[in-house]
C-alpha cells in the first residue's frame, strides 16, 4: 500500500498548499532522519532542514523559515528542556509507539510541542495496555479521551491495590478513536 511516510507528507503538503500550515516539524528516530529528508525532497520540492548540532545552534534552527524541520526524539526532548517548548504549525511523529509510556522524558517533551495539527505514525500497533493507547491519543487530540483520571475511571478496572485487572467500555473508546485513526 501507500506508505505512512508518503501519506503524512501528502497531508502536510495539502495543508501547506492551502495555506493552513507553513512550518512542519517531523520527529522521528535518529535512524530515519535522512530517509525523511530524502522523501520530503523527492515528493515536495520544499526546503528541508535536519535539526542537529550543539543545542545553541539547534535553538536558532527552530526559528529558521525552512518549511520542513526534522529532528530525532532524543534531540527534541533535550531541546524542549532547553527552550521550554517547540513551535510548529504541524508536527508529524513517526514511530509514535516510542511515546507509549506517558511519563517518560520523551513523551513529556512531545506534549510540549505547540502545533495546530499533529499526525502520529506507527507501523506497530499498541497491543499491551490501554494506558499506552491513551498516551499516544493524548498527543493527537488531548480532548478526545478526556483527562487521565476520567479515562482511568471510565475504561480501566483495578483491584484494591490499584493494579489493572481488565478494561471496560472498549466500544466507546473505539468510536472516539476511530474518528482520528487510519488503519
Regions found by a protein language model. Name each.
Residues 32-54:
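Conserved helix-turn-beta segment of the N-terminal RecA-like "Helicase ATP-binding" lobe
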Residues 70-85, 105-111, 115, 120, ...:
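Inter-lobe coupling linker of SF2 helicases/translocases
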Residues 2:
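ATP-binding Walker
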Residues 7-37:
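Conserved SF1/SF2 helicase motif Ia
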Amino acid at each position: 500500500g501507500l506508505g505512512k511516510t508518503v501519506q503524512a507528507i501528502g497531508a502536510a503538503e495539502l495543508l501547506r498548499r492551502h495555506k493552513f500550515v507553513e512550518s512542519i516539524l517531523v520527529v522521528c528516530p535518529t535512524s530515519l532522519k535522512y530517509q525523511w529528508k530524502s522523501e520530503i525532497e523527492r515528493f515536495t520540492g520544499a526546503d528541508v532542514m535536519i535539526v542537529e548540532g550543539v543545542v545553541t545552534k539547534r535553538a536558532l534552527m527552530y526559528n529558521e523559515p525552512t518549511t520542513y524541520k526534522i529532528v530525532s526524539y532524543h534531540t527534541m526532548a533535550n531541546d524542549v528542556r532547553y527552550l521550554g517548548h517547540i513551535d510548529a504549525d504541524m508536527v508529524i511523529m513517526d514511530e509514535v509507539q516510542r511515546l507509549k509510556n506517558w511519563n517518560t522524558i520523551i513523551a513529556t517533551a512531545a506534549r510540549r510541542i505547540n502545533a495546530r495539527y499533529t499526525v502520529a505514525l506507527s507501523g506497530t500497533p499498541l497491543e499491551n495496555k490501554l494506558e499506552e493507547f491513551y498516551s499516544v491519543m493524548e498527543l493527537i487530540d488531548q480532548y478526545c479521551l478526556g483527562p487521565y483520571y476520567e479515562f482511568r475511571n471510565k475504561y480501566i478496572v483495578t483491584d484494591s491495590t490499584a493494579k489493572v485487572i481488565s478494561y471496560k467500555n472498549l466500544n466507546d473508546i473505539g468510536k472516539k478513536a476511530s474518528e482520528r485513526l487510519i488503519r
